[in-house]
Amino acid sequence: MLVLTRKLKEVIQIGDDIEITVLAIQGDQVKLGINAPKHVEIHRKEIYLAIQAENNAASLASKTSLEQLNEQLKHWKGGKQA
């Protein structure tokens, strides 16, 4: 992990396209401004983890739904052929 010290209004550059600016420091909080291209997703860690959990849950639900649909189709085909 790279650790940097910055003062108010100072900037960290990441690659060619991303800038992080220290906008304010109040007590134990630091306010950051982030300039990045629109295609770069930026989230707080807790939001990112919540999104990942939702995506995983949706993926599992979709798989279960598809498996149930497949079973129903098998029964339907079996009833038609008999």
Swiss-Prot record:
It is found in: Cytoplasm. One of its GO terms (biological process) is regulation of bacterial-type flagellum assembly. Transmembrane segments: none annotated. One of its GO terms (molecular function) is mRNA 5'-UTR binding. Keywords: Bacterial flagellum biogenesis, Cytoplasm, Repressor, RNA-binding, Translation regulation. Pfam families: CsrA. InterPro entries: CsrA, CsrA_sf. GO terms for cellular component: cytosol. Belongs to the CsrA/RsmA family. Homodimer; the beta-strands of each monomer intercalate to form a hydrophobic core, while the alpha-helices form wings that extend away from the core. A translational regulator that binds mRNA to regulate translation initiation and/or mRNA stability. Usually binds in the 5'-UTR at or near the Shine-Dalgarno sequence preventing ribosome-binding, thus repressing translation. Its main target seems to be the major flagellin gene, while its function is anatagonized by FliW. This is Translational regulator CsrA. It comes from Geobacillus sp. (strain WCH70). The lineage of its organism: Bacteria, Bacillati, Bacillota, Bacilli, Bacillales. The gene is csrA.
